[in-house]
Swiss-Prot record:
NCBIfam families for the chain: miaA
Enzyme Commission number: 2.5.1.75
Protein name as annotated: tRNA dimethylallyltransferase
Tagged with keyword Signal: no
Organism: Arthrobacter sp. (strain FB24)
PANTHER family: TRNA DIMETHYLALLYLTRANSFERASE
Length: 312
């Protein structure tokens, strides 16, 4: 993904375009399948909003939708990064909004699908990402080393008391001061608001948590049986462990430990299951906080029809 250093993406759309659709929910809940079903009914195209599915070669461990599962529906923003590249939510915002505009320009419906909550909000909501300045950052980090966190926090309190009260660690205090020096605006002024940048509708998949726990365990075991360790080994040769984002992906970080001789396959599998379940709980907490989402039972036989009713 390539974009200007500082941007908030395209912020206007032609009048009369249909609402963007976003299918959200925890991992393993069936978002990809529902997005494809909606696309087939609405003449739509799907935009990936799962940060780990940006990576080429990370297929098994991310449950990336296969060509067969796409059922002829065009998919965008899959396989856009090498594992050594860092995923950027601001870059995604730019790419996603440009892709939405292109899809609408073809007279099609744009359908986001993914469980990376901040990425979904970046595409849908009024959300700005201030740029960075390595020189300012370096100077502030040197001041942190010389004068200490308390000194930088007092400076932040003078220009942005909201951030000073909210941010606890040194890295974030440095970032808040960097943003103020770079933009003249308080870092807190860039915080997201629940306001769509263009019309949108979000479809959430309501899950039975116990059933989801079982499904996630089965899915991880299936990934291992289908060659997850070999996939991690191939990607390690391509620099996986040096990628700040990709190396932290569920399953991949665990099986790197297998390659290093720290864990056996069983340990890596069980840790991946536990970590995936925790991740699903965090996703549910994130999406549940958004009152705009229309929730539907993931196992409802009329799921597609009910989702279509709020999308048309």
């Amino acid at each position: 993904m390539a974009s200007p250093q500082e941007h908030s993406g395209p912020t206007t759309q032609p009048r009369g375009v249909p609402p963007v659709i976003a299918v959200v929910g925890p991992t393993g809940s069936g978002k990809s399948d529902l997005a494809v079903a909606l696309a087939l009914e609405l003449d739509g195209e799907v935009i990936n909003a799962d940060a780990m599915q940006f990576y080429r070669g990370m297929d098994i461990g991310t449950a990336k939708i296969t060509a067969e599962e796409r059922r002829g529906v065009p998919h965008h923003l899959l396989d856009t990064l090498d594992v050594t590249e860092e995923a950027s939510v601001s870059d995604f915002q730019w790419e996603a909004r440009a892709t939405i505009a292109e899809i609408h320009g073809r007279g099609k419906r744009a359908i986001l699908a993914g469980g990376s909550g901040l990425y979904v909000r970046a595409a849908l909501d009024v959300l700005e990402f201030p740029g960075t300045d390595p020189g300012i950052r370096r100077r502030l980090e040197e001041e942190l080393d010389d004068a200490g966190l308390a000194t930088l926090r007092r400076r932040l309190e003078a220009v942005d008391p909201v951030s000073a009260a909210r941010l606890g660690d040194a890295r974030r205090v440095v970032r808040a001061l960097e943003v103020f020096e770079l933009t003249g605006r308080a870092f807190s002024s860039f915080m997201p608001v629940r306001e769509y940048y263009q019309p949108a509708v979000q479809i959430g998949l309501e899950v039975d948590r116990e059933l989801l726990k079982d499904r996630l365990a089965q899915r991880v075991h299936g990934m291992v049986a289908n060659g997850l360790q070999a996939e991690v080994q191939r990607l390690d040769a391509a620099g996986l462990r040096h990628g700040k984002t990709a190396s932290r992906a569920l399953g991949y970080s665990q099986f790197l430990k297998v390659l290093d001789g720290e864990w056996d396959t069983g340990q890596a599998t069980e840790d991946t299951i536990v970590a995936t379940r925790k991740f699903a709980r965090r996703q549910l907490t994130w999406f549940r906080a958004d009152p705009r989402i229309h929730w539907f039972d993931w196992q409802d036989p009329d799921l597609v029809a009910k989702a279509l009713a709020v999308c048309r």
